[in-house]
C-alpha cells in the first residue's frame, strides 16, 4: 500500500491546486491570494454522519467566517453528482471540490491508509487547513473530531 505524504508545515506556502467545484467552475487556491483566508477542509465522504455534521457546522457559521475574511472550501474524492446532491440537500453556501484522483489530498498529506470494517483501504483523513491571504499555512487541524471543530477554527480566525 502506498505511503502517505507528510502534512504541510505551518508558515510555509500551501500546495496550490485547481479542482472542479460545485459552482461549475474550477477553483484554485491562487484565486484567493491577497483577498481572503481559506478554510480548506478535507472530509472522507458526502452524506456520512460525521461529514454531514461537519459541513452543516460550517454552513451554520458561514456568515461569521465570511465576516472574518475567510472562504470555506470542502474537498473529498466524491464525484460531482454526489457533491451537488449533498450541497443542495444541506443548503451549503460554499463550494465542494472534487479530488477524484486524490492528488490534492496527497499533496496536503491527508490521503492515508485506513482500516474500514477490517479491510485496509486508502482514503481522506478528516483534516482542516487555515491558509492565510498570502497563501501560507496558518493552522492545521489533523485527525479532526467533528464536535466543536468548526467553532475552534472560527476562534482561530477571530483571535487578536
Positions of PLM-derived features:
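Chalcogenol-based redox active-site neighborhoods
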Residues: 1-160
Amino acid at each position: 500500500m502506498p505511503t502517505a505524504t507528510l502534512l504541510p508545515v505551518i508558515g510555509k506556502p500551501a500546495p496550490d491546486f485547481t479542482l472542479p467545484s460545485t459552482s461549475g467552475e474550477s477553483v484554485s487556491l491562487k484565486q484567493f491570494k491577497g483577498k481572503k483566508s481559506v478554510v480548506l477542509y478535507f472530509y472522507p465522504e458526502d452524506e456520512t454522519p460525521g461529514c454531514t455534521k461537519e459541513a452543516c457546522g460550517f454552513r451554520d457559521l458561514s456568515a461569521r467566517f465570511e465576516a472574518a475574511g475567510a472562504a470555506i472550501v470542502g474537498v473529498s474524492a466524491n464525484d460531482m453528482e454526489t457533491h451537488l446532491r449533498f450541497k443542495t440537500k444541506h443548503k451549503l453556501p460554499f463550494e465542494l471540490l472534487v479530488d477524484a484522483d486524490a492528488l490534492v489530498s496527497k499533496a496536503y498529506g491527508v490521503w492515508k491508509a485506513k482500516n474500514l470494517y477490517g479491510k485496509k483501504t486508502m482514503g481522506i483523513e478528516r483534516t482542516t487547513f487555515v491558509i492565510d491571504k498570502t497563501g501560507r499555512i496558518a493552522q492545521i487541524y489533523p485527525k479532526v473530531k467533528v464536535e466543536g471543530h468548526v467553532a475552534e477554527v472560527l476562534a482561530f480566525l477571530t483571535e487578536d
